[in-house]
């Protein structure tokens, strides 16, 4: 079972979100890491918190990047063990 470690927060029609999604898909696939995508348009709380900074990537629930996702930086973050619940 793959553990979800990456959350990508964005919205449809956002070209930076499309770019971020491509990086997340690539890195997650390489490392066998699960990821989910959420839209600020579907959740008022997400929109209030992140709406001006999309796309946002969270790793293990913590903000990792916004606007642009660096593949090398994402790989480095995912090379560290996930925190225990």
Spell out what each predicted region is.
Residues 1-5, 82-85:
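Compositionally biased, disordered extreme N-termini, encompassing classical targeting presequences
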Residues 2-26:
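Local sequence-structure signature of Cys/Sec-based thiol-disulfide redox active-site neighborhoods
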Residues 19-22, 49, 69:
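Generic recognition of short, well-ordered alpha-helical segments
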Residues 33-44:
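Thiol-based oxidoreductase modules, predominantly thioredoxin-like and allied folds used
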Residues 42-55:
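Short Fe-S-cluster ligation motifs
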Residues 55-63:
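A short, hydrophobic beta-strand/beta-hairpin element that forms part of a small beta-sheet core
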Residues 62-85:
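Non-catalytic, surface beta->alpha helical segment in thiol-disulfide oxidoreductase systems
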């Amino acid at each position: 079972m793959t553990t979800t470690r990456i959350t990508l927060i964005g919205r449809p029609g956002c070209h930076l979100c499309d770019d971020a999604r491509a990086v997340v898909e690539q890195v997650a696939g390489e490392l066998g890491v699960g990821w989910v995508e959420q839209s600020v348009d579907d959740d008022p709380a997400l929109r209030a918190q992140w709406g001006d900074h999309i796309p946002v990537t969270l790793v293990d629930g913590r903000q990792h990047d916004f606007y642009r996702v660096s593949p090398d930086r994402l790989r480095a973050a995912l090379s560290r063990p996930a925190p225990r619940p």
